[in-house]
Swiss-Prot record:
<feature type="topological domain" description="Extracellular">
    <location>
        <begin position="430"/>
        <end position="440"/>
    </location>
</feature>
<feature type="glycosylation site" description="N-linked (GlcNAc...) asparagine">
    <location>
        <position position="349"/>
    </location>
</feature>
<dbReference type="GO" id="GO:0006824">
    <property type="term" value="P:cobalt ion transport"/>
</dbReference>
<feature type="topological domain" description="Extracellular">
    <location>
        <begin position="323"/>
        <end position="360"/>
    </location>
</feature>
<keyword id="KW-1133">Transmembrane helix</keyword>
<feature type="transmembrane region" description="Helical">
    <location>
        <begin position="483"/>
        <end position="503"/>
    </location>
</feature>
<dbReference type="GO" id="GO:0015099">
    <property type="term" value="F:nickel cation transmembrane transporter activity"/>
</dbReference>
<dbReference type="GO" id="GO:0005507">
    <property type="term" value="F:copper ion binding"/>
</dbReference>
<feature type="transmembrane region" description="Helical">
    <location>
        <begin position="507"/>
        <end position="527"/>
    </location>
</feature>
<feature type="transmembrane region" description="Helical">
    <location>
        <begin position="180"/>
        <end position="194"/>
    </location>
</feature>
<dbReference type="GO" id="GO:0015094">
    <property type="term" value="F:lead ion transmembrane transporter activity"/>
</dbReference>
<dbReference type="GO" id="GO:0005768">
    <property type="term" value="C:endosome"/>
</dbReference>
<dbReference type="GO" id="GO:0055037">
    <property type="term" value="C:recycling endosome"/>
</dbReference>
<dbReference type="InterPro" id="IPR001046">
    <property type="entry name" value="NRAMP_fam"/>
</dbReference>
<dbReference type="GO" id="GO:0005886">
    <property type="term" value="C:plasma membrane"/>
</dbReference>
<dbReference type="GO" id="GO:0070826">
    <property type="term" value="C:paraferritin complex"/>
</dbReference>
<dbReference type="GO" id="GO:0030145">
    <property type="term" value="F:manganese ion binding"/>
</dbReference>
Length: 568
């Protein structure tokens, strides 16, 4: 729907920030031509607990830096960083070390830096507009593309949830010395999710502190493994800062691509843009907005530095201890250590292949039972923390895209059911190798969903009607465009490699049809993104059918006078 300048928007009331949003129009007009937000009345997210409380920012005279203010803004970045430490990332890390040694640490560093820059865009969108990414997508895209985009993001969230369930189930199985079967661990994760989700009833800061506690557990457990194995520090530094991969072949290249897919999570853009709304920022004051952007970026830098160090711990442990090890060598060590898991590995001369489960077993064989149990505790912390942030992501995405308010209980029931059923079937009817093998497929799935977060975040943060003076400059636009192109190229590589392994004509046909539909939708989003980046000649005077217009009518989001229209 495109409104004439004289046409009035029905006064539906406030549209989305649930708090200090009345001042948004003073600095940030945003537009919509496909649909307008439906009001929820005077209620303030009645089913959501996360935004029931907003953290006040201490008032001080302006200074370049204040530790008090940084502490007040600390929280969202560490919750966001959980996605960089989920079981899928841990599995990617250990496989990277076992397959390529220290050679791919620079890829991990580069992927983390790229992730940081993308999180910066997500946080800025939430701070400047008072809306998270899903809400902005709801206001901008027409109905059909909006629904498709929502389904793609939900698919990414469910895939991530499956990884968390798998990781938690394996950790419980290891901690119980196999007494709790894998399907039992899967069922336990259903119950513990509800327990942990009640924590935010005790206050936002306590919830954020609990996440900090889980990150600390991961740092201590994986740090213990690092100290125990004693990897070569010179090799670690060389792998981190020298971008090369001598002697690398297809497995190493595929692993490098897998690192990118594991580190940069699509749903994390939606999550971070929503989490920053938990701080009280007067968006009518440009100085406060700039200050919030600065402190959120500093916090994100600290949080992702911590997550990077933890990931380096895991890569280095497996690079030092298990790079180029054979199954025969591992079996011999496990038998000498009287490990009950010696039969887990084939007694042949092929290169050792590890996953989350086997990784814990070989650590126990080489460095004692303590290493196995401490590894399992770290994996459990990774799975549980990711479970909670995944639930928040799902809630924000559903509420934003569909303007639908669900209780968190109902939301967990839905997503957990979808994630649990296939995972439970594999756990019951297959072995642990098939269960952990799902992580590789799910990392590919996450990578394929990346454009559905990267393109919208780049589009909207580049639009001046949305971001006012905080829109992306030419440098960010060029860098973002190159990044999206690179990610899409990586995805196509993933698709080609994966399809080649299918080995069946019917599957080739299905893959071809899905690939065409996938690329078509990515092209659609990319087209709109290029117009937003300034290539207005692409709109051909007809882009209003797509959701972007050469002269988009905009309205002041969340203002009391919702009928006021202005034109760019």
């Amino acid at each position: 729907m495109v409104l004439d300048p004289e046409e009035k928007i029905p006064d539906d009331g406030a549209s989305g920030d649930h708090g200090d949003s009345a001042s948004l129009g003073a600095i940030n007009p945003a537009y919509s031509n496909s649909s307008l937000p439906h009001s929820t009345g005077d209620s303030e997210e009645p089913f959501t607990t996360y935004f029931d409380e907003k953290i006040p920012i201490p008032e001080e005279e302006y200074s370049c830096f204040s530790f008090r203010k940084l502490w007040a803004f600390t929280g969202p970045g560490f919750l966001m960083s959980i996605a960089y430490l989920d079981p899928g990332n841990i599995e990617s890390d250990l496989q990277s070390g076992a397959v390529a040694g220290f050679k791919l640490l620079w890829v991990l560093l580069l992927a983390t830096i790229v992730g940081l820059l993308l999180q910066r865009l997500a946080a800025r969108l939430g701070v400047v507009t008072g809306l998270h990414l899903a809400e902005v997508c709801h206001r901008q895209y027409p109905k059909v593309p909006r629904i498709i985009l929502w389904l793609m993001v939900e698919l990414a969230i469910i895939g991530s949830d499956m990884q968390e369930v798998i990781g938690s189930a394996i950790a419980i199985n290891l901690l119980s010395a196999g007494r709790v079967p894998l399907y039992g661990g899967v069922l336990i994760t259903i119950a513990d999710t509800f327990v942990f989700l009640f924590l935010d009833k005790y206050g936002l800061r306590k919830l954020e502190a609990f996440f900090g506690f889980l990150i600390t557990i991961m740092a201590l457990t994986f740090g213990y493994e690092y100290v125990t194995v004693k990897p070569s520090q010179s090799q670690v530094l060389r792998g981190m800062f020298v971008p090369s991969c001598s002697g690398c072949h297809t497995p190493q290249v595929e692993q490098a691509v897998g690192i990118v897919g594991a580190v940069i999570m699509p749903h994390n853009m939606y999550l971070h843009s929503a989490l920053v709304k938990s701080r009280q920022v007067n968006r009518a004051n440009k100085q406060e907005v700039r200050e919030a952007n600065k402190y959120f970026f500093i916090e994100s830098c600290i949080a992702l530095f911590v997550s990077f160090i933890i990931n380096v711990f895991v890569v280095s442990v497996f690079a030092e201890a298990f790079f180029e090890k054979t199954n025969e060598q591992v079996v011999e060590v496990c038998r000498n250590s009287s490990s009950p898991h010696a039969d887990l590995f084939p007694n042949d001369n092929s290169t050792l292949a590890v996953d989350i489960y086997k990784g814990g077993v070989v650590l126990g064989c080489y460095f004692g039972p303590a290493a196995l149990y401490i590894w399992a505790v770290g994996i459990l912390a990774a799975g549980q923390s990711s479970t909670m942030t995944g639930t928040y992501s799902g809630q924000f995405v559903m509420e934003g895209f569909l303007n639908l308010k669900w209780s968190r209980f109902a939301r967990v029931i839905l997503t957990r059911s979808i994630a649990i059923i296939p995972t439970l079937l594999v756990a019951v009817f297959q072995d642990v190798e098939h269960l952990t093998g799902m992580n590789d497929f799910l990392n590919v799935l996450q990578s394929l969903q990346l454009p559905f977060a990267l393109i919208p975040i780049l589009t909207f943060t580049s639009l001046r009607p949305v971001m006012s003076e905080f829109s992306n400059g030419i440098g960010w636009r060029i860098a973002g465009g190159i990044l999206v192109l690179l990610v899409c190229s990586i995805n196509m590589y993933f698709v080609v490699v994966y399809v080649q392994e299918l080995g069946h004509v019917a599957l080739y046909v299905v893959a071809a049809v899905v690939s065409v539909a996938y690329l078509g939708f990515v092209f659609y989003l990319g087209w709109q993104c290029l117009i937003a980046l300034g290539l207005s000649f692409l709109d051909c005077g007809r882009s209003y059918h797509l959701g972007l217009t050469a002269r988009p009518e905009i309205y002041l989001l969340n203002t009391v006078d919702a009928v006021s229209l202005v034109s760019r």
